[in-house]
Amino acid sequence: MKLPFLNKNHSTSSYSSNSSSSSWPWPSCNQNPKTLSFRATITFTNPIHDQDDDELDLLDPPEITDSVENVIKGLRSSERLIFESKGETNSILEEATSKREEEDEEEGFMLFSLESDDPYSDFKRSMEEMVEAHALHHDWKSLEKLLLQFLKVNAKTSHRYIFAAFVDLLMNLALDTKKAIINNDISKDDGVSASRAAAAGEASTSCCNSMTLGESPSSPLSFYTSCSSSSSSDETSSMSVRFLPLSSLLEMDEKTKEILV
């Protein structure tokens, strides 16, 4: 027994299956499967890490390092690259100090360094020796140059001692100059006083010698005046002695009376 609707449905279903199979664009899974198996070992690589490794290899390859060392050895052997120090040591400060000492020796004095417990006294004594050796007592320009030299060759921590010693040196020089002037004036005053005293002694001697007792030729009695000498701090004056006979005094008295009458 045949049922028509069943046949119709069957044909419809077959048609639909054929149309669907023809319209499906993707192949089915059972046709030549090419899917990789998950059991296979998969290796993932990071391109960034690969780039870093390549850069490290390029930065420090053993061949380039060896070639650089060979170049340096070749330069040394051919005397193109000379590693020599011109001074005794490699210290720049020591070379500058030695150069400064040579310049100071050319200027006429020698520089030396020492450790001092009393820098003020040492600086002052050194300055006094320089002044005495070069006769700088009244030469202000040379004294100023001396101060600048001390400041130049010493550290700033020692400048206060240098200034103090220099000021005291100037004070001592000024006092010595003043004492010399005073002594010179005193010696001059002593010479003048001695000459004045000698003159006064001679005057007093002549005065005393002139005071003699004796008879006047005109009269048995004679009148004399005593000598008087007055001395001061500036001048010494002496009065000469004059002898007048008594008769002369009487004549002078009579003439005076006539004039008055």
Curated annotation (Swiss-Prot):
It is found in: Nucleus. Transcriptional repressor that regulates multiple aspects of plant growth and development through the regulation of BEL1-LIKE (BLH) and KNOX TALE (KNAT) homeodomain transcription factors. Disruption phenotype: No visible phenotype under normal growth conditions. This is Transcription repressor OFP15. Pfam families: Ovate. Residues 1-28 are annotated as: Disordered. InterPro entries: Ovate, Ovate_C. The keyword rRNA processing does not apply. Plants over-expressing OFP15 show small rosette size, late flowering, reduced fertilization and blunt-end siliques. GO terms for cellular component: nucleus. Expressed in roots, cauline leaves, shoots, flower buds and siliques. Interacts with BLH1 and BLH3. Residues 112-172 form the OVATE domain. Keywords: Nucleus, Repressor, Transcription, Transcription regulation. Residues 11-28 have a biased composition (Low complexity). GO terms for biological process: negative regulation of DNA-templated transcription. It comes from the Eukaryota.
